[in-house]
């Protein structure tokens, strides 16, 4: 995770696995899966195309360290946009962009309006 407080809480709740939680933009080594939960929703710029490129670049940097795949969730609408500092992707466009990494499955996240979970596997 990139948030020190989240890592501290994970280590507190799971002390037997504390060494498995780290702060950083990339996993510290090879992992089975990388999970990005809400990581890319808050956006501090006002250029949705640039933010989407940032997301794909971040995933591209992480992909070589993933043995099996990556999972992420994004808010999705009919148009790629940023509204009130929240990024919204177009599900079909994001699915197509993620195919450069591998097989992509996308599904609405139950109980969360506009939220879509993407699973990318090798």
What are these language model-derived features?
Residues 40-42, 75-80:
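Short "lid" loop at the C-terminus of a central beta-strand within the Rossmann-like core
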Residues 81-122:
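Class I S-adenosyl-L-methionine
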Residues 31-32, 68:
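Conserved acidic residues
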Residues 33-52:
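A short SAM/SAH-binding and catalytic strip from SAM-dependent methyltransferases
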């Amino acid at each position: 995770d990139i948030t020190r407080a989240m890592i501290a809480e994970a280590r507190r709740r799971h002390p037997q696995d504390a060494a498995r939680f780290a702060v950083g933009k990339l996993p510290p080594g090879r992992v089975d899966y990388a999970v990005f939960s809400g990581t890319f929703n808050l956006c501090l710029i006002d250029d949705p195309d640039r933010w989407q490129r940032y997301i794909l670049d971040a995933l591209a940097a992480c992909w070589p360290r993933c043995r099996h795949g990556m999972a992420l969730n994004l808010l999705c609408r009919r148009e790629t946009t940023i509204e009130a500092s929240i990024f919204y992707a177009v599900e079909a466009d994001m699915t197509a962009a993620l195919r450069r990494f591998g097989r992509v499955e996308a599904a609405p996240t139950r109980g969360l309006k506009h939220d879509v979970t993407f699973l990318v596997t090798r």
